[in-house]
UniProtKB/Swiss-Prot annotation:
The active site is at 167, 235, 352 (nucleophile). Homodimer. This is N-succinylarginine dihydrolase. Keywords: Arginine metabolism, Hydrolase. It comes from Novosphingobium aromaticivorans (strain ATCC 700278 / DSM 12444 / CCUG 56034 / CIP 105152 / NBRC 16084 / F199).
């Protein structure tokens, strides 16, 4: 079978909560302390996966990581249920975080057509800027090495050293004539100095490119606009997304946009760059609606579709631009709203929830691939075992810890993934 793009969505974990742990993530901050609905959140995510399967796309799934994380707590001299003070409460909340559902941060992926050994390379992201995410990568690597165990087709690398912050595919884009053709890889980094941290370090991006053996002339290292980070674009995928020959971006996404566009066109002459001007959609509206945190996909018909959160369609300026684009000869021919409101309330849209891997599905462990029957199996597990709701004040409850642990165990049993238990 030829190489195709597979979107591996992270299933929203049973400990999904709104503890407000993510500095620079406006949605996370604004919903801190609210009651979350893990069961509804997971079902919404599965609804998006089913939606994309119905489009004729190849869909994968990653399981939630173990939470509350005893390794993380033990390293801090804490446990999951003891009484703690206010400062320690945030550390404990980090150990309960379900943030691994945003698999765009799981790894950076370079497919076989771009690499010298003809294998797909994946480097786990260290996510060191945020404590609640910094604990993820060892368990993420375990899952990646299971899903992509075929060493003839995949190479999975450990995270780069923690002194260089790496946020994975959320700050990486690939452009190409087609998914199975050689492409260019665009690494987007930030610079420090603003009110919010620049999570992606340039040296982390360059290290990943070296680990993957990418040809320097096929790589671009581009600075994210400081004003975008300051406005709440904590990852580049909040203000830009690419698919095959198309870059879809806000006017204020990059520090030097014209130089960025010129460098892309020099390396990929057929590139089509769709820029949304700030005079039509403000940076604030783009970030609030998550217009660009969308899945830009090549459909089986060959046309491109944009899977957006319903919040984007409900934002007048965004809807106006999308309707005008659909009426034009632009490359995006379908706009497909989906409901992932529970994830959105924590700062994660459709693009955050998936990791794109270009590969032959036959080379992937089939336990990580979905069809309608497997979606139904996972939905049944979620309905039976995921908590209906969690108040952040509940974090630390022994009963809740047992419920969360049991829910994940039931999922792994249903998917026959006992290696991850």
């Amino acid at each position: 079978m030829p190489l195709v793009e597979i979107n591996f969505d992270g299933l929203v974990g049973p400990s999904h909560n709104y503890a407000g742990l993510s500095l620079g993530n406006l949605a996370s901050a604004s919903n801190a302390g609210e009651v979350s609905y893990p069961r509804a959140a997971a079902l919404q995510g599965l609804g998006k996966m089913r939606h994309n399967l119905a489009l004729g796309l190849t869909q994968g799934l990653f399981a939630p990581l173990p939470r509350p994380n005893p390794v993380f707590l033990g390293a801090l001299g804490l446990n999951a249920i003891d009484e703690v003070d206010q400062a320690q409460r945030r550390l404990r909340a980090a150990a309960w975080s379900a943030s691994s559902m945003w698999t765009a941060n799981a790894a950076t992926v370079s497919p076989a057509p771009d690499t010298p050994d003809g294998r797909c390379h994946l480097t786990a992201a260290n996510l060191v800027t945020m404590p609640h995410r910094s604990q993820e990568w060892p368990d993420t690597v375990r899952q990646l090495r299971l899903a992509f165990a075929d060493a003839a087709h995949f190479a999975v690398h450990d995270a780069v050293p923690a002194c260089f912050g790496d946020e994975g595919a959320a700050n990486h884009m690939r452009m190409c004539k087609s998914h199975d053709a050689p492409g260019i890889e665009i690494f987007v980094y930030g610079t420090t100095g603003g009110a919010f941290p620049a999570r992606q370090h340039e040296q982390a991006s360059r290290a990943v490119a070296r680990l993957h053996g990418l040809a320097p002339e096929r790589c671009l290292f581009v600075e994210q606009a400081p004003e975008a980070i300051a406005a709440g674009a904590f990852h580049n995928d909040v203000v830009a997304v690419a698919n095959e020959r198309v870059l879809f971006t806000h006017e204020q996404a990059f520090a030097n946009p014209e130089a960025t566009y010129a460098a892309i066109r020099e390396r990929l002459p057929e590139a089509e760059i769709v820029v949304v001007p700030s005079s039509v959609v403000s940076l604030a509206d783009a970030i609030r609606s998550y217009l660009f945190n969308a899945q830009l996909l090549t459909l089986p018909s060959g046309e491109m579709g944009l899977v957006i959160p319903v919040e984007a369609w409900e934002t007048p300026s965004v809807r106006g631009w999308l309707e005008a684009h659909l009426a034009s000869n632009g490359p995006i021919r379908r706009v497909l709203p989906v409901d992932v409101r529970q994830s959105m309330a924590n700062g994660g849209g459709p693009a955050c929830l998936r990791l794109r891997v270009v590969a032959d599905p036959a080379t992937v462990d089939p336990r990580f691939l979905l069809d309608e029957a497997r979606v139904a199996i996972v939905e049944e597990v979620v309905r039976r075992h995921w908590p209906e709701q969690i108040d952040p004040a509940d974090l630390g409850s022994d009963i809740l810890a047992q419920t969360v642990h049991g829910a994940r165990g039931a999922l792994l049993a249903a998917l026959e993934l006992s290696e991850l238990a």
